[in-house]
Amino acid sequence: MAMKKLLIASLLLSSATVYGADGFVVKDIHFEGLQRVAVGAALLSMPIRVGDTATDEDIGNTIRALFATGNFEDVRVLRDGDSVVVQVKERPTIASITFSGNKAVKEEMLKQNLDAQGVRVGEALDRTTISNIEKGLEDFYYSAGKYSTTVKAVVTPLPRNRVDLKLVFTEGVSAKIQQINIVGNHAFTTDELISRFQLRDEVPWWNVVGDRKYQKQKLAGDLETLRSFYLDRGYARFNIDSTQVSLTPDKKGIYITLNITEGAQYKLSGTVVNGNMAGHSAEIEQLAKVHPGELYNGAKVTKMENDIKQLLGRYGYAYPRVATQQEINDADKTVKLHISVDAGNRFYVRHVRFEGNDITKDSVLRREMRQMEGAWLGSNLVDQGKERLNRLGYFETVDTETQRVPGSPDQVDVVYKVKERNTGSINVGVGFGTESGVSFQFGIQQDNWLGTGNSVGFSGTKNDYQTYAELSMTDPYFTVDGVSLGGKIFYNDFSADDADLSDYDLRRYGVGTTLGFPISENHSLNFGLDYVHDDLTNMQPQVTMWRYLDSVGINPKVVTTNKADSDADFSADDFFLSMGWSYNNLDRGYFPTAGSRASLTGKVTVPGSDNEYYKITFDASHYIPLSESGNWVLMGRARAGYADGLGGKNVPFYDNFYAGGSNTVRGFRSNTIGPKAAYYKCNSGNTRYSDCPVDKSSDAVGGNAMAIASAELIMPTPFLSEKYANSVRTSLFVDGGTVWDTSWQNTSATRAAGIPDYSDPGNIRISSGIALQWMSPLGPLVFSYAQPVKKYDGDKSEQFQFNIGKTW
């Protein structure tokens, strides 16, 4: 029976008679200890095979090769006659990785760090590298300024040679910056330079961007900010010589010292443009033109390069190369720019494709395209298509990608990748005010009906004072040229008295249609025709109301003994011709971050109507991004309206302008801003209502003129994950507005009753507050809390409002 011998030991004691000078011929190879690793995989990693002559060098190489696979903790090679026996001890497999104590860093980031070290579930765990794993994670924390963090890896054995790897973190506190020193600055003070940093040694309470917690990445960003600051002001030789970061003994404080060389300011002496400009040299040279003697500016140079690339991109040169070299003359402190341009190949579009539109039909997206298939690639046209898709409001995100066609030197495919959002909604509106209590609204809206791009909606309100219903539909592409067609039918039964408005009941129904005509990429005109029937009953003697009735030829009686005798009933059938202009270049349809939207609309009664008047409204919004990410946005909105009678008739009081509420001036109850009703209180001695005394009230009656303005600072929602940034929006706002009646007559009777002059537009109401909008899976939710800052007698506050709905 053959004796197994440890080959390494045997070789040390070898003799030619046992192994031979050239080793032995391997007739078989056996493995002992394999569990997870397949025999075939182990054999492939070995340098020797059956039939080979094994030498001591081969055996050593075999051991090293098996260790190199990372699958084994121990390897031994034995000889059993002419057979090689390989004894191994496999490393355990990581069954799970868990974390404990990590509050400052998310698990996803820690897993990415481990993955970079080759530590992941399903892989073998090398126990000898545990300390390296711990140190790698600690270094990761150090880069975030948490120098007192410790990491302990706990390995728990499991059946079948598996282990659970648990990483326990003791984070401690973040190291705070005690002082930032800049050495070598002469043209600018240290405070002036540090004021542009994210990292600060002192952070005022109002600065929501500054941070005293040290982070390596933020320091790198601040260094780039410092470099750009100097380069943009002519310091072409500026250099950051060294950066020193010192840690206090308790690891809680950081001292940062930046050593810089400012150099002198340099001026531009001119530009030289050369290279392949694809026949657009005149346009490129115009973009590269500078004024000799102006200060060198690094930001302008970068913009110049980007402008040249964009110019060439509009002509189909998708991948141009533009590089700028500086010729610095230290003697006269000037810089000449040498701009090298290589337009490259001109590309044509083979296909325009869409991905991610599972509901919306391709034709709906394709009709928004300005880049045509078969034409040369125009980067501006591709961008216009992206903007138009965003503006539809059907998608959470829209991304574009230009893919080169394999085997073609001059063809590309343009791919629009969209992520659809829920465009249908069933909304229940809830409002709560200190005086109004709770009210409800209901609505169904589908902005992308069956993926056709058509809008279909039904809305209704049912409460103690109103029953309202409206059915509407709009086809934005009624014709292939983009002419839109819309229509609606509505019914409204309204008791103004129960709504704390002027006393009357209104039953109204009507139908209307609108045609819209695009006149440019962002401008459109629309024309409409509407029919409206109004029945007014239970009208009580009120100055504005009676003045209107008198203008249309109705002279209500003045009788005080019977309330019913003082009522007046009135019906009107009106036909309106409406006209409007609109402009829209917002970057997306919902939650915009840049651009403007404006509209000017008007309507006028046509012959055959019982009323004769016109009404004009203007509404404009503008968004200014304050950060590249679009998280910080300044929004301003202005609205104005005016109406006046024709042919000696007054504007119907029931079609007045109103303000107050969630869509106008938040913090005030809906429709309560502006003129209030003044009721006649006649007695038996009065024969004309104009002779009657009047009483003031808090019932809103509206006015024929309106002006409203809002300013909002849109900001990141605190404690919210970045992935929800496109569905949640928080803002601080200030609203202001007023409604007035230009035909109001401030008589002795109204003055005696203490009624203010309602023709004065200066009675402006102001409120401020905070708002949150959320496109939640359960539906759109809007929350606002506002406090009136400036109010007048009779105004009614409503601080808290929210809407909640269901989307599909």
From Swiss-Prot:
State the disulfide connectivity: none
Q: GO CC terms on record?
A: Bam protein complex
Q: Which residues form the POTRA domain?
A: 24-91, 92-172, 175-263, 266-344, 347-421
The answer to whether keyword DNA damage applies is no
According to its UniProt record, where is this protein mainly located?
A: membrane
Q: Where is the signal peptide?
A: 1-20
Subcellular localization: Cell outer membrane
Function description: Part of the outer membrane protein assembly complex, which is involved in assembly and insertion of beta-barrel proteins into the outer membrane. Constitutes, with BamD, the core component of the assembly machinery.
Assembly behavior? Part of the Bam complex, which is composed of the outer membrane protein BamA, and four lipoproteins BamB, BamC, BamD and BamE.
Protein family per UniProt: Belongs to the BamA family.
In terms of NCBIfam families, this protein maps to:
OM_YaeT, PRK11067.1
Q: What is this protein's record name?
A: Outer membrane protein assembly factor BamA
Organism encoding this protein = Sodalis glossinidius (strain morsitans)
